[in-house]
């Protein structure tokens, strides 16, 4: 598994994909951090992280589109199935490599509360909880993109479908509001597909255990389908 992780992680930075993902996310975060937190004086990072969500939904498909689609197109997926390494470990290695690329950005984000602290008192705990929530949301989004990539040979189709799924999930609260407001069974099912809502639960700086469990269950369910 660790050999797969290292190989995949290295491959992302041997071409433009890894650098593009890290740079784009970091640049947009830096822009909103400057506007919201430094210029306008907001002490909370939640608003900055929320502002880059749409860009993140565009960046994730670019990162995940080749995870399995490229193997299926080149027919190298058969080698993975017959390799002495269990398929589950190969899948986990690929996933952790993409998560590590995303974590490069998160590591930089973790420095920003310290920058704000130099200008005055800020809610440090709430800031780091917001970063943790965004990391969990990103981890679930990457799992979705990886799952979709395993369904097709085309990287373009994988990228487009991943964005569509993430965008629909992002808009799920609005969509369920149009369907019904009385909390019927349909809205409850649709709310289970909303990856973004658990992230919003961290807005007040509360470490919501149910949101963490939701992301953990989502990841486990998607990985089980990838290895089956």
Each model region followed by its residue ranges:
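Aromatic- and glycine-rich beta-strand/loop motifs that create alpha-glucan
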Residues: 1-18
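Hydrophobic alpha-helical transmembrane segments
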Residues: 19-22, 128-132, 159-160, 212-216
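Secretory targeting signals
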Residues: 29-34, 45, 55, 97-158, ...
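Transmembrane helix segments
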Residues: 32-35, 152-203, 207
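Long, hydrophobic alpha-helical segments
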Residues: 48-70, 105
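Helix-loop-helix units of permease transmembrane domains in multi-pass membrane transporters
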Residues: 67-97
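Conserved small/polar residues in nucleotide/adenosyl-binding loops
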Residues: 220-227
